[in-house]
Amino acid sequence: MNFPGRSVLKEIHRIHEDGFDFIDLTIEPPAAWKADGREVGKLTRDLGLSAVGHTAYYLPIASPWPEMRRLARDLYRHCLDKFAAAGIELVNVHPDQRLPLHSKEQVRARNAEAIEGLAEDAAERGIRLMVENLDRMFATAADLEPLFDRVPDLGFHLDIGHANLRLGLGEPNRTPVLLEAFGDRLAHVHVSDNRGGGDDLHLPLGAGAIDWKEAIRNLKRAGWDGTVTLEVFSREREYLRASRRAWIEWWQEVRA
């Protein structure tokens, strides 16, 4: 994934140099927001990279204020226009967890309504939307199910790191449960390590508490052989490269 504080074109070159065969393109401030979709599409094609789209997790798509919801939808459409210009056909959305004084049922319903509208906007541009599991609300199958019920073509974007956060006493990583519920909708995967608890650390693979061989086994049992983003954040690029090498080694080693 490109770092949104740097030039998108420079980030694409960096990702290509590190041996990756696709880019998880995030369009958000401060720098990535200014990307020219046509330039991005030309560069990725020239380098032989495919791409999926990623959007800011903090867009208030389900805000209690109608004015904020309209603005968030307009901003999301702005992203979709850039993705469409780049030839990207799969884009994620994060449910909005920030609805104080609302019940779980209200939060789920408001997000289902918002994501239905965004999915329509995406479809008009030839793009399929996928929803990412989070770490508070929308961490469980029960939270996510109303979204999929409302939007039949909505894809599932599995974040294995998020599935390891805010677990109950004795509760294992939620990946197997989420795949059992939504494996037939699986469209993309994010991986990064953490130590559980509430901190989404985005550590290199193997630096936290996640059993990555078991995670890969679960993906293979679900029939997954598609795109996987190493969402490892560090100033030192070698941590990302090492995670790539480890993932490839484990993927080749593990059997379903």
Model regions and ranges:
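Active-site-proximal loop/turn and secondary-structure-junction residues that shape catalytic pockets
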Residues: N2-F3, I27-P29, Y57-L59, P95-L99, ...
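Conserved, mostly hydrophobic/aromatic
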Residues: I15, I23, T44, A72, ...
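Hydrophobic faces of well-ordered beta-strands that scaffold small-molecule active sites
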Residues: M1, I23-L25, A51-T55, V91-V93, ...
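Acidic (Asp/Glu)-rich catalytic clusters
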Residues: I12-D18, W33-G53, H78-G87, E116-E124, ...
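Acidic/histidine-rich catalytic cores of soluble enzymes
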Residues: F22-I23, G117-A209
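N-terminal pre-domain/capping segments
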Residues: M1-A84, G155, I248-A256
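Active-site acidic/histidine proton-transfer and metal-coordination neighborhood
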Residues: S7, A62-F156, I210
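Distinct, well-ordered alpha-helical segments
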Residues: S7-H13, W33-G41, K104-E116, D135-P152, ...
